[in-house]
């Protein structure tokens, strides 16, 4: 993508933006601009409104009709000359023409021009710009806080926020600004909140006024999404109904909230209720684009073929019954047997592919076949190691599919409080996994976190955000913009730091890229599967029945996620036998050097940033420091783990002393994390603390300070160790 006025060097970026911002504001005084939509649509009106807001902030008088203005911006669609979702910005004299390949591209063009103006470009300095999407599907997975997949106060605390339409307006604004194009709303049972199914009024728990409130919420979310050019989907888990339906008919006794792991109820009542609910939902919500189906929880006791047939006969048939265009997300099965336990199988892959291909072209556009990339912990290695249940064969890819495309879900179950941003990880991910002709795009999102209520911020000073997603603006901007165009340069993201915080923040993107790589390296080193098996920013993992700090013993024994990484156990065992590792393998000493190099450089980059005048900037810098110290903690812990395992395999007492020394240093870095985070972060409810239980755990507060005792135990583990104790 050509970025026009943002094509500046990193060195000169801050000064460039400050100078241009000042000049642009002065020049704009007393000038008027007409922002015109010759072919008015809700999307053109939205793009014009957002652009007009920026122009007004820059000091222009904005008009919506030609009244002899000094400047004009014309918004138009030309499907003949641009790809869908593409746009061009063409300046000529006092007229700037924004052309979209469709209405969505038109919005992107308007927002791109607004971004130029916000970053200081003067009207007459706008240069020709064009862009088109790299990937067709760029979605956010959003788990709703009602009828949630799991019971937890970490999720239910968002209930009121997620019913606030002002919140949704801001969230959807963020999505389109970052060029996401689909919002997918996930919960166990969406239909109870959306319709009163005609033949099953007893299934609804609501009064008329209560149901009207729920329906207004959904209608407005879908309307606002459509206005912003966003596709909308509801996604759910197979056989779940309302408690009221289950109790009225004596069916589905464990297939309603808070149950989420039960046997499949294939009774005629449940089949009819769900098929009719799907149909009625699509009929009553014309702005809803599609539905996503799952073959997982709520289907225990059914074989893979029975699950697939049930989905076809009930859910997919309900969509087709609606007699209107519908888009389909078809998730790959999670289990290969009759239980709900995870499992991958080529036979199930063949069964699923054949079923999807039988659907032909009955759904609008390609069917999006959703696959979890590296299970629940996609912010690890960009190498595809596993999906939900195990390794994935090439069944879905070879031969090239004709009516569907694969969409990867990169889940985040690892960092909710600390801000994250590693642009080169995303670029590499797309380069490795997003360029194949069978790939349609990506989801990003979480199962154990909802980006709604800000339950993190402890300081009372004013900050620049109201809701949780606004704290993580860099995460969303990086993923959204790079999925649209992986060639988007870092200067685009650096410019946002400077615009928000001034020239002193110019180093923050680089600092985040270095410091928050700690998450990627931890999750590449420490193998994980489902949601609770790792919580990166807290160095927690599911161990037995509970979620706890990753002890030195657990770190030694744990296999790696990335096959290029070498575990402590394998490293020490190989060296003790006189072996070695090929070039390209990431051994513990190499990983230690990487962690320390990047953490120390990140700390250097933020060391001189003055945060005294901005609580928001203080948080940005503090999160860099927290990630960096987590990296330094992990580095010392790895050194201690190698020394301890060497001692246990027959090393000398010096190895034991070395292990104790390094683990004491690791504790000091943890104390530094506490020093950074205790004053500014609340104790935070964490879904992972449910552990292996399917019930909510009320004792679920996390803070780095709360687990210091677990961290300190590493030193005692080393002191108590004996040779031969493995």
Predicted regions and their residues:
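N-terminal secretory signal peptides that target proteins for export/translocation
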Residues: 1-11
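C-terminal non-catalytic alpha-helical accessory regions
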Residues: 446-696, 700, 718
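Extracytoplasmic/secreted proteins, especially bacterial periplasmic and envelope-associated proteins
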Residues: 43-46, 50, 105-108, 112, ...
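Acidic, contiguous N-terminal accessory segments
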Residues: 12, 16-20, 28-93, 123-126
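Terminal, low-structured helical/coil segments at or just beyond the last alpha-helical repeat
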Residues: 702-726
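Feature activates predominantly on carbohydrate-active enzymes
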Residues: 40, 47-50, 54, 82-86, ...
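Catalytic-core regions of glycoside hydrolase
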Residues: 62, 181, 197, 201-211, ...
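Conserved, mostly hydrophobic/aromatic
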Residues: 102, 140, 175, 293, ...
């Amino acid at each position: 993508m050509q970025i026009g006025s943002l094509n500046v060097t990193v060195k000169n970026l801050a000064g460039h933006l400050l100078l241009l911002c000042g000049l642009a504001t002065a020049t704009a005084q007393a000038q008027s601009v007409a922002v015109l939509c010759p072919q008015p649509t809700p999307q053109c009106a939205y793009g014009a409104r957002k652009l007009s807001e920026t122009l007004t902030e820059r000091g222009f008088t904005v008009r919506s009709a030609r009244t002899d203005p000094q400047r004009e911006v014309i918004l138009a669609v030309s499907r003949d000359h641009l790809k869908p979702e593409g746009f061009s910005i063409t300046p000529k004299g006092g007229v700037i023409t924004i052309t979209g390949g469709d209405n969505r591209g038109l919005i992107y063009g308007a927002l791109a021009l607004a971004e130029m103006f916000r970053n200081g470009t003067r009207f007459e300095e706008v240069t020709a710009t064009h862009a088109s999407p790299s990937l067709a599907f760029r979605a956010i997975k959003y788990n709703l806080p009602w009828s949630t997949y799991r019971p937890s106060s970490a999720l239910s605390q968002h209930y009121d926020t997620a019913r606030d339409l002002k919140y949704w307006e801001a969230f959807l604004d963020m999505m389109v600004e970052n060029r996401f194009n689909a919002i997918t709303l996930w919960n166990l049972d969406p239909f109870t909140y959306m319709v009163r199914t005609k033949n099953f009024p007893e299934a609804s728990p609501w009064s008329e006024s209560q149901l009207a409130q729920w329906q207004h919420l959904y209608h407005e979310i879908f309307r606002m999404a459509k206005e912003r050019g966003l596709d909308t989907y509801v996604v759910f888990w197979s056989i779940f109904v309302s408690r009221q339906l289950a109790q009225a008919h004596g069916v589905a006794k464990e297939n309603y909230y808070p149950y989420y792991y039960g046997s499949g109820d294939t009774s005629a009542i449940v089949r009819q209720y769900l098929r009719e609910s799907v149909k009625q939902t699509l009929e009553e919500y014309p702005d809803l684009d599609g539905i996503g189906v799952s073959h997982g929880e709520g289907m225990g006791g059914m074989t893979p073929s029975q699950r697939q047939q049930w989905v076809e006969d009930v859910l997919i048939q309900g969509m087709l019954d609606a007699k209107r265009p519908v888009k389909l997300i078809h998730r790959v099965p999670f289990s290969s047997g009759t239980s709900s336990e995870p499992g991958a199988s080529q036979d199930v892959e063949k069964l699923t592919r054949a079923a999807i291909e039988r659907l032909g072209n009955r759904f609008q556009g390609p069917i999006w076949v959703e696959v979890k990339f590296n299970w629940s912990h996609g912010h690890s290695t960009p190498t595809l190691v596993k999906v939900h249940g195990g390794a994935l064969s090439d069944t879905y890819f070879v031969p090239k599919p004709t009516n569907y495309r694969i969409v990867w879900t990169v889940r985040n179950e690892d960092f909710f409080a600390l801000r994250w941003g590693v642009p080169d990880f995303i670029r590499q991910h797309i380069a490795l996994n997003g360029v194949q002709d069978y790939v349609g795009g990506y989801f990003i999102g979480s199962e154990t976190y909802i980006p709604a209520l800000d339950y993190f911020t402890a300081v009372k000073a004013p900050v620049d955000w109201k809701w949780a997603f606004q704290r993580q603006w860099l995460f969303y901007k990086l993923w959204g913009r790079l999925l649209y165009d992986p060639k988007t340069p870092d200067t685009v993201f650096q410019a946002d730091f400077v615009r928000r915080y001034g020239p002193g923040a110019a180093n923050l993107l680089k600092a985040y890229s270095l410091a928050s790589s700690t998450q990627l390296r931890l999750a590449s080193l420490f193998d994980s599967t489902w949601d609770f098996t790792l919580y990166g920013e807290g160095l927690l993992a599911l161990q037995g029945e509970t979620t706890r700090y990753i002890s030195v013993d657990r770190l030694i024994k744990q296999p790696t996620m990335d096959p290029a990484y070498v575990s402590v156990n394998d490293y020490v065992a190989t060296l003790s036998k006189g072996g070695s590792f090929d070039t390209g393998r990431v051994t513990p000493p190499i990983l230690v050097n990487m962690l320390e190099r990047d953490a120390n450089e990140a700390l250097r980059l933020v060391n001189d940033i003055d945060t005294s005048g901005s609580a928001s900037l203080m948080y940005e810098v503090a999160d860099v420091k927290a990630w960096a110290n987590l990296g330094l903690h992990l580095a010392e812990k790895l050194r201690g783990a190698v020394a301890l395992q060497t001692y246990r395999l027959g090393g000398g007492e010096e190895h034991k002393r070395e292990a104790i020394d390094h683990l004491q240093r690791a504790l000091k870095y943890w104390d530094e994390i506490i020093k950074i985070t205790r004053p500014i972060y609340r104790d935070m409810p964490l879904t992972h603390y449910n552990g292996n239980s399917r019930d909510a755990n009320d004792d679920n507060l996390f803070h780095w300070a709360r687990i210091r005792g677990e961290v300190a135990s590493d030193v005692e583990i080393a002191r108590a160790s004996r040779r031969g104790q493995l």
